[in-house]
C-alpha cells in the first residue's frame, strides 16, 4: 500500500472537558446539515517518533519541520540569548547566527538576531556548494573550491582554497560545529580522505586519509576533527596520526563534536541499535549516556552546539540542545516539544466502547476508549503491530478488522504477501493488550471475517464453500478451528452460530460449545438469505442487492422490513447502518420499536471508497454502542451517537471452570463472562454458610468481565472448600437493570 498518514489528539464535542494533547473539533463541513453532529472525534497519530529537519540553526535559535512533509516550518528562539554588539562579514565569529538563501547566482545573508544583511554574487563559471556563516563555498570548472564573502563596498571577494591535493575530486562539503571551518571529503587515487578548510585564510589541511566509503561521516568543531571513527585535534602539528576510536559499527554513527565529546547514536528507530545518544570523550575515551530513547540525526550548529531529538514516545518527543561546558563536557537541555503527526486510517473497527484503528505506515493497531455516549475518554493506546495481507491502493476496507467485544479484535494475516494469489491464511486475534495475540491457521486464501463475538470468530474463505469458526480462548495464545462447514450466510453471536437453513427464511442456531442445534427460526424471508447477521435477539437477513431485507426479533417474534440495496449493511443493537455509495450517505435504520425509521447520520467523503467489506471507513458497535466513520481529514475519525436505546444487560457466554488444583496464588481462578455491552461489576465469594470471604470489583474490558481470585480470603487466610460466587454487573449506560449470575468454585 502506498497510503501513509501520529499518538492521538482526542476531542469531545459538546462537553466541557478536553483531554491532554486534544483539540476541539467541529463537525465536518460535508456532514452539515443533513447528518447528525458527531459527539467527538479522534485523530490517529503516528506511534513512531518522527525525524526532524532543521532548515536553519544557529546561535539564537533554529527552525524545524517534520522530515519529508509539507508541514509548516516552526521557529524557536533560545531563552536568554543576547545579540552581539557588532555583526558582519568582517567578523567571522558573528556568523553563527546567519541565515543564507540562494537564488540563482545571488546569495543573500541575514544575521538573524541583529538583522544585518549582506549579498554575494557567484562569479560566472562557479557552482554553489555550501554556506557557513558569512562565507559561501563554490567550485570552479576545474574543481577548485573558492570562498566568497561580501566586502564593505558591496562587492564580493573571491578567495581560492589552497592545499587541496592536485587531482583530488571533492565529493562533499560538510558543515560542522564551527563557523571558522568547513569540511571537505575528497577522492584521490581511488581513496577517500577528509580535512578542513580554514575560512579565515582559505588554507586546507587533510586530517584523515584512507576513509572507509561506508563510514565516511565527518564531524568537527574548533577543537576536534573526526572521520571514519578516527579523531585528531584541529591544532595538532601537521602529520599527527589520528586516534582510532574502536568498538562502534553500523548502524551506530557519529553525528557531531560538542566540546571534547563525540556524539554517537543511531539514526534508525526500528530497533536496529541501542537508541541512546552517547557522549564519547575524545580526551579520556570514557562514555556516558547523554539522552535516552534518542533517534534521528543529531545536527551540529555553527556555534559549537548540536540539536538532537529524544523522548519516550511520539507523544513526548522533544528537541534537545547539546552545549559544551567549560571543562569540555556536553550538557543537554530540552528546548521544545515536537507536535505529533496525523496518519491515515486503513482499517476501522468498533466494539464494546473501544475504537480500533490501523495504519499501514508502520503504526500497526491503536485503540481509543469511548464512554457510553460515544465520546472519547482516553488517549491513543498501542495495540500491536500487524502482519497483514497486502491491499489495493485506495481500499480502506482492506485490511479488515473485526471488534470482538471483549477488548480484542480479529484480522486475517497471510503467510506471505502476494498481491495476485495471496498466501495460506490465519485468523489473528489481538489483545486485550499490545503483546498478546492468538493465531489460528485456516489454510484458505483471500478470505475475510464477517463477524465474531468474544472467543469465537467466523471466517469465510475465498474458495467456494469454505467457512470456519475459530475458537480463541481468551488469555491463551492457542486457538483452534472448531467448525468447518459448507459456506452459507451465517453469523456468530455469543456461543451460537446462526446460519441460513435449507428452506426460504429458515435460520438455524448451532451451539459452538456442544455442536448441537439449539434453535430453528422462521424469519419470514422469501429467500435463502445471502447475508445474515445476529446481535442480541435480532436477526438481520437480506435477499441480495435487488431483493428485500428485514430484521426478525427472536424475543418478540416480530419481523420488520428494512431498506435493502447493493451496498453492505451492518447490524447493531436495535439498528442497522448502510452506506449509500452513490450519495455517500451513511444511513441508520432504527427498528427497535418494531417500526423502521431511517435517518442520515453522516455523509462520507467521496474518496477512499471501500471496495470490499463494510468495515474500513465506517464501523458500528454492536455491543450496545454507536457509529464511527472517517471524515476525510487525514487520520480523523468521528463518532456519532446512534440515538437508539441498547438492550438490557445479558450474558452471551462464560468460562467459570475451576482448575484441577483449585484457586491458588500461582494459578488463580480466572473466570470470564462475555456480556452484550460494557458494565461495572462486583464479584462476591462466600462460604456455603453465607459468610462473605472476598469481594472483587472492576470494570469490563469491552463487554467482557474478567476477574482473578487467588483463593485467599479478605484476611489473607486460605481455607479449603467450596465457595459460592455471585457476579453483579451494572450496565455502563445505565439502561436496564443489573445482571446477577451465581455459581461455585473450589479451593483445595
Predicted regions and their residues:
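Secretory targeting and sorting signals
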Residues: 1-33
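Surface-exposed loop/turn elements that mediate protein-protein interactions on large endomembrane-trafficking
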Residues: 31-55, 61-95, 100-125, 140-168, ...
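Structural signature of eukaryotic scaffold interfaces centered on beta-propeller domains
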Residues: 47-58, 89-94, 127-130, 172-178, ...
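Aromatic/hydrophobic beta-strand junction motif of beta-rich domains
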Residues: 62, 225, 539-541, 668-677, ...
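Short, compositionally biased P/S/T/A/G/V-rich stretches that sit at domain boundaries
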Residues: 342-344, 638-668, 744-748
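C-terminal tail/sorting-segment detector
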Residues: 554, 728-748
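Glycine-centered tight-turn motifs at strand-turn-strand junctions
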Residues: 691-718
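A short tyrosine-centered beta-strand micro-motif
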Residues: 719-729
Amino acid at each position: 500500500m502506498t497510503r501513509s498518514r501520529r499518538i492521538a489528539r482526542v476531542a469531545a464535542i459538546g462537553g466541557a472537558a478536553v483531554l491532554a494533547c486534544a483539540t476541539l473539533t467541529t463537525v465536518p463541513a460535508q456532514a452539515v446539515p443533513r447528518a447528525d453532529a458527531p459527539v467527538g472525534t479522534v485523530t490517529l497519530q503516528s506511534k513512531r517518533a518522527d525525524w526532524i529537519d532543521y532548515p536553519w540553526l544557529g546561535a539564537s535559535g533554529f527552525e524545524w519541520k517534520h522530515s519529508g512533509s509539507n508541514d509548516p516550518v516552526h521557529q524557536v528562539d533560545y531563552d536568554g540569548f543576547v545579540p552581539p554588539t557588532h555583526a558582519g562579514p568582517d567578523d567571522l565569529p558573528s556568523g553563527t547566527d546567519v541565515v543564507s538563501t540562494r537564488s540563482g547566482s545571488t546569495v543573500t545573508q541575514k544575521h538573524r538576531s541583529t538583522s544585518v544583511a549582506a549579498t554575494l554574487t557567484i562569479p560566472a563559471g562557479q557552482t554553489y556548494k555550501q554556506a557557513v556563516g558569512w562565507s559561501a563555498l563554490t567550485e570552479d570548472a576545474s574543481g577548485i573550491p573558492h570562498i566568497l564573502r561580501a566586502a564593505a563596498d558591496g562587492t564580493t571577494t573571491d578567495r581560492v582554497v589552497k592545499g587541496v591535493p592536485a587531482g583530488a575530486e571533492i565529493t562533499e562539503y560538510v558543515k560542522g560545529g564551527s563557523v571558522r571551518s568547513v569540511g571537505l571529503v575528497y577522492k584521490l587515487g581511488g581513496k577517500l580522505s577528509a580535512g578542513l578548510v580554514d575560512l579565515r585564510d582559505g588554507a586546507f589541511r587533510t586530517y584523515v586519509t584512507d576513509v572507509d566509503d561506508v563510514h565516511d561521516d565527518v564531524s568537527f568543531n574548533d577543537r576536534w576533527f573526526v572521520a571514519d571513527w578516527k579523531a585528531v585535534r584541529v591544532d595538532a602539528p601537521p602529520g599527527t596520526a589520528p586516534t582510532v576510536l574502536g568498538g562502534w559499527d553500523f548502524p551506530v554513527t557519529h553525528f557531531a563534536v560538542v566540546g571534547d565529546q563525540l556524539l554517537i547514536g543511531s539514526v534508525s528507530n526500528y530497533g536496529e541499535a541501542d537508541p541512546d545518544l552517547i557522549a564519547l570523550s575524545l580526551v579520556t575515551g570514557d562514555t556516558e549516556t547523554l539522552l535516552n530513547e534518542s533517534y534521528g540525526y543529531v545536527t551540529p550548529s555553527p556555534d559549537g552546539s548540536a540539536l538532537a531529538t529524544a523522548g519516550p514516545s511520539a507523544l513526548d518527543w522533544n528537541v534537545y540542545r547539546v552545549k559544551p561546558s567549560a571543562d569540555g563536557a556536553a550538557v543537554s537541555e530540552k528546548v521544545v516539544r515536537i507536535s505529533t503527526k496525523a496518519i491515515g486510517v486503513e482499517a476501522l473497527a468498533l466494539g464494546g466502547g473501544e475504537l480500533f484503528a490501523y495504519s499501514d505506515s508502520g503504526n500497526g493497531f491503536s485503540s481509543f476508549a469511548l464512554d457510553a455516549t460515544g465520546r472519547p475518554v482516553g488517549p491513543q493506546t498501542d495495540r500491536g503491530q500487524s502482519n497483514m495481507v497486502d491491499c489495493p491502493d485506495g481500499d480502506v476496507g482492506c485490511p479488515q478488522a473485526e471488534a470482538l467485544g471483549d477488548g480484542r479484535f480479529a484480522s486475517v494475516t497471510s503467510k506471505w504477501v502476494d498481491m495476485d494469489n495471496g498466501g495460506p491464511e490465519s485468523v489473528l486475534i489481538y489483545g486485550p493488550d499490545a503483546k498478546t495475540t492468538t493465531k489460528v491457521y485456516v489454510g484458505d486464501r483471500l478470505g475475510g471475517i464477517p463477524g465474531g463475538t468474544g472467543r469465537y470468530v467466523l471466517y469465510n474463505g475465498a474458495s467456494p464453500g469454505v467457512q470456519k469458526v475459530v475458537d480463541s480462548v481468551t488469555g491463551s495464545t492457542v486457538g483452534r478451528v472448531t467448525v468447518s462447514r459448507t459456506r452459507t450466510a451465517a453469523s456468530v453471536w455469543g456461543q451460537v452460530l446462526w446460519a441460513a437453513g435449507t428452506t426460504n427464511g429458515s435460520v438455524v442456531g448451532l451451539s459452538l460449545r456442544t455442536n448441537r442445534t439449539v434453535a430453528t427460526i422462521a424469519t419470514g424471508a422469501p429467500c435463502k438469505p445471502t447475508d445474515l447477521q445476529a446481535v442480541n435477539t435480532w436477526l438481520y437477513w437480506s435477499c441480495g442487492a435487488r431483493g428485500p431485507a428485514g430484521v426478525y426479533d427472536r424475543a418478540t417474534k416480530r419481523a420488520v422490513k428494512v431498506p435493502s440495496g447493493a451496498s453492505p449493511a451492518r447490524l447493531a443493537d436495535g439498528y442497522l447502518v448502510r452506506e449509500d455509495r452513490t450519495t455517500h450517505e451513511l444511513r441508520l435504520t432504527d427498528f427497535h420499536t418494531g417500526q423502521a425509521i431511517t435517518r442520515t447520520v453522516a455523509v462520507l467523503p467521496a474518496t477512499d471508497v471501500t471496495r470490499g467489506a463494510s468495515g474500513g471507513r465506517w464501523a458500528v458497535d454492536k455491543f450496545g454502542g454507536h457509529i464511527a466513520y472517517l471524515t476525510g481529514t487525514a487520520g480523523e475519525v468521528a463518532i456519532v451517537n446512534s440515538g437508539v436505546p441498547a438492550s438490557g444487560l445479558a450474558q452471551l457466554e462464560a468460562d467459570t471452570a475451576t482448575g484441577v488444583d483449585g484457586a491458588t496464588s500461582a494459578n488463580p481462578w480466572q473466570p470470564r463472562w462475555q456480556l452484550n455491552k460494557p458494565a461495572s461489576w462486583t464479584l462476591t465469594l462466600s462460604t456455603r454458610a453465607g459468610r462473605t470471604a472476598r469481594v472483587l470489583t472492576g470494570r469490563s474490558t469491552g463487554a467482557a468481565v474478567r476477574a482473578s481470585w487467588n483463593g485467599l480470603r479478605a484476611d489473607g487466610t486460605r481455607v479449603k472448600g467450596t465457595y459460592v460466587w455471585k457476579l453483579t454487573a451494572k450496565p455502563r449506560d445505565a439502561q436496564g437493570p443489573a445482571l446477577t449470575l451465581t455459581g461455585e468454585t473450589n479451593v483445595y
